[in-house]
Amino acid sequence: KNQYKTPTGFQNYKIRKETIKVKDSSDVILEVKETLHGPVMNGFLDGINGAKPVTMSWVFTQQKNQMLEAVYSLSHSKDLPDFRKGVSLIAAPGLNIMYGDAKGNIAWNTSGKLYKLDESVNPNFILNGTNGIDDKKEFLDFSKNPHAINPSWNYVYSANNQPEAVDGYLYPGYYLPQDRAKRILGLLEPKNNWTKEDVGKMINDNTSSVAPIVASNLISALDSKSLSLNEKQAIEILKKWNGSNDLKDIAPTIYNKWIYNYLKNTFRDELGEANFKMLLSTHIIKQIIAPQTKNENSVWWDDISTKNKKETRNEILNKSFHGAIAELEKQLGNDLNSWTWNRVHTLEHQHPLGKVALLKGIFNVGPFEVSGSNEVINNLMFNFADSGEYVVNGGPSTRRVIDFSDIENSMSILPTGQSGNPFSKHYNDQAEMYADGKFRKMKLNKEEIIKTSTELIFRPMK
């Protein structure tokens, strides 16, 4: 109970107490057990309740992390070497940091104190802290961090995708699939004469280069003899789809419902309801969607709740499609032409106090019907749910276009507004523009700022 196993024998836990103050209630006292690999998370994190202790090991707590110095250095950097010096001060988190200057230099560099594990170790799973192998780390010099400086292809980008190997080694990480990266490359490669208006359009691009391929994989599994009229019409819509997720598109409504049903019918029987919902909230599920549709030999296709029967890929995808169309008919009606994306994909900026019904109209901003989707450049993302409604739970915290040859006419937009005061006119004055993919001119000229500013005076109470 008070000891844990290590490669050199058993050691005592270091035990500390943490006190959480709760307003208008008793303090919550937590007893935390510390090991060589970090704190034991059993009982603290959902899904970790077994007898074997599971600890959390994080570079952030193990290395010198000069975050404030890094921010200061980056803010005051004069050139590329200054920039890279600032990035090198960040031990964690791992970030893709972009650079550009008025002299035409461009670069990107990952931050973080990166390391290599033994070749036999799979970091996608919980590691064994007792064998002396899984926890061996070779910390790497900053020069080994993935980066590109003035690359021959003349641009840099990041979409949280897997970077190329360094010295033959692919750094493991919690990456997103290649969807956005593929679309960005597809837009950048053919064109050299970019304007800030072109870049603004690209930032709001709603098209997936991958989704039509996935849709084709799904369609290939269908038994065409068993389709209703609505199902046949739905298939034709998906066959003609270019991957766009605009307000009046019908295909994304059908596609996402089918995707959700296929994931549910594939994984929920093995994982159970709680773990399946947890999986839906991770990056892992986004990595799974495309390759699983092609993997006919996957053991996941079998529904373990059915006895004396082994389901196949085709059976699960057919079942998922029929269910998707039936559910959409119930949710949106029998007219497929009315199944437009704006009816199910919405954005509402929710305030903690907005959960109170009487205060919702004061503090919450929206909802708005919005274009975009998961894993498109206009990444207004959502989690799948039985409801068939795709409520945005994340997206760009800001959109900016800065032309170094015309700084004073740069463009930006915020999701809601500049003020956090719900009674300010600037609390939500950008929200509709943001939802519509529009921009506002940034004020970077001192004279213009002074000319259009207002004065706020704070007077002490007497």
Predicted regions, residues:
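C-terminal/peripheral segments of proteins
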Residues: 1-220, 224-227, 240-462
